[in-house]
Design a protein with these regions (language model features):
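Cys/His-clustered metal-coordination modules, chiefly Zn-binding fingers
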Residues: 96-180
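FNR/FR-type flavoprotein reductase catalytic core
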Residues: 1-118
Length: 180
């Protein structure tokens, strides 16, 4: 950490920075994906949704959300812009899906407006799991105690979880000491 940075303001470059919700003037089509209902959003985001010209709206609460999301993204015409509103775990899952469908990062706005859920990728077993924003957790896959690093993979849409005690990674698991 340089002398110009202090622990209160330092933020690694890989940790996501989220933009304010604003319609893209150059977009011909506005695709809006919400984790929750519009009326559950803060008033400023409800106003953003109301101000979008003819948005195509998809809620994660709708039946068959995953299938509808893929259909929407693969059928999106040129000039579309995607706005994703939800917690960090949700917005990055949708981001990964959108990029898989061919959208560029410049065509996607992520608006983090949910709980403190985030995705953590275990570098030991490869499981990606949604967790509260904590510094340590036990992997649901391999049960190794992970330290969650302030390194975010945009490709995976997750923070990196690495073994907290690499010299004895599986000792607690073998002894049955790790809590689920």
């Amino acid at each position: 950490m340089s002398s110009a940075q202090n622990s209160d303001t330092y933020r690694p470059f890989s940790v996501p920075q989220y933009r304010q919700a604003a319609p893209k003037a150059c977009a011909l089509h506005h695709l809006l994906v919400l984790q929750n209902a519009v009326d559950e959003l803060p008033e400023s985001l409800q106003a953003f949704v109301r101000d979008l010209p003819r948005p195509i709206l998809l809620s994660a609460r709708s039946e068959g959300f995953g299938k509808h999301l893929n259909t929407l993204l693969y059928a999106a015409p040129i000039g579309s812009h995607l706005y994703v509103l939800g917690d960090e775990a949700f917005v990055w899952q949708v981001h990964v899906t959108a990029q898989g469908a061919g959208m560029l990062s410049e065509e996607i706005d992520l608006i983090n407006c949910g709980s403190a859920q985030r995705r953590v990728f275990c570098v030991h077993c490869g499981l990606t799991q949604n967790t509260p924003a904590v510094a340590q957790l036990n992997c649901a896959g391999c049960r190794v105690q992970l330290g969650v690093r302030e390194h975010f993979s945009k490709r995976l849409g997750a923070y990196m979880g690495v073994c907290e005690n690499p010299d004895q990674a599986y000792d607690q698991v073998q002894q049955g000491e790790v809590q689920p």
